[in-house]
């Protein structure tokens, strides 16, 4: 068999969304990694400038956050506003300060020149909690969570275009393991509520429990 090819002939353009990265609250990925207000490399928002420079250099089109296994017990509301309680991270069994939350993640992505992609809690989360997160990020002023974002200093919506539901909730290792019937109902109802809050966003299919 012969396969002819022309090495210098362009045949199409790769979608930049093929090249992305993943940021989880795991070991030093966030604290001491991308975010460290005590570092001599920290900017005015606590982001490490050396990491931001690296992000701008490799040019990922998109970054997913907050997990990973971590997201299956993560409740986003603890990570916004001035009063943020420290919580126990049931995935990695450490204390989470919640100092780096939604607003910080979106700001980090904007500074790095990439799109923020939020993965919601498909383990212990609810459809309402997920849709409230969309409201906080994307609605201009309608609703208590959009108003809360404004009170937190972000008048304009974050306009997060990429969302998904859950992580590896098919596995026994994951908090909030679900069978196929439980999973399909959660995804269906969560997506329905999220889309009713803000329809025009991208919804990558979540992994399906077997």
Residue ranges of predicted features:
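Non-catalytic accessory regions flanking glycosidase/transglycosidase catalytic cores in CAZymes
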Residues: 1-210
